[in-house]
Amino acid sequence: MSSPILFAIACLIWGSTFWAITLQLGDVAPAVSIVYRFGLASATLFSWCLLRGDRLRMPWKVQRWMMLQGVATFAISYVCTYTSEQYLVSALVAVLFVLMVFWTPICNRFMFGTPLTWRMWSAAAVSICGVILLFYEPISHAWNDILAGGSGHFLLGLGLALCATVTSTIGNVVVVKVREESSNVFLTMAWAMFWGTLAVASWALLTGVEFRLPSRPSYWAGLLYLSLFGSVIAFGAYFTLIHRIGSQKAVYIGVVTPVISVLLSIQLEHYRPGAMEWFGMVLCLSSVAWALKAPSPAKNEPSIPLESKLEAP
């Protein structure tokens, strides 16, 4: 399969996963949908690793990091993402996730001492301005709603979406430690998804969340799409693309996917951004593209894992 086709596959799948999450909402609690999704995804990845002849057992020094990655990325982050999409259109959540491009180097600075360049700081400042423009009017309306005695659920959704980007970034930074012990990406992903599934399932059971099987066909279509396409096939295309054209080019998938998410929201969720929102999105995405063109880090700096540069629900 050619590189342009692989690039298109990854962009289209990850760009549509934010909307596909909306198919999972309403029938059961978000935690239940997450357990179903990553339970199926991890089982698929484990099966694939077995077919390749991989040894599934991993030493404890690797498992402890995969547990942390799973809880941060596939548990807390996705619970926040799914819950936030109950209050925000999926396009807004997708645009917020590009902030991970800036959270990641900041986390690496604290954990590994990786220096931050002026270009990264400048791009982050532009991106923050874009986010402010994107959310200025919705936040104003939500605040007026609160003053009028309303619930202000939009602000809750915004806070949860931001929390999702931060916890997902933490999980991605932890991958640095995982990669030091194992280079088997699909096996470590399978274990991380397993631990994330176990964490969400345990929390759901302890809080009395009801587990049941929805009857709506679109729910199961969304589940299969998110589990198999969004969590397995897209990553396969992404890593193959990295091997062919390099991570510096493949990472631009992270700029294209929010655009696809916005177009889908306009078509399927009746999202109608105004001039200020469009300008905010352009600022945010262009700043990300600028940041991704920054020079590579010095040789003595710890490398950022390939999959930490891009993460999509």
Predicted segments with their positions:
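Juxtamembrane helix-entry segments on the extracytoplasmic side of multipass membrane proteins
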Residues: M1-P4, D27-A31, V35, M58-R64, ...
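Hydrophobic transmembrane alpha-helices of multi-pass small-molecule transport proteins
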Residues: L45, L99, L116-I139, D145, ...
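Transmembrane alpha-helical segments that form core, pore/gating elements
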Residues: L45, T104-I106, F110, H141-G208, ...
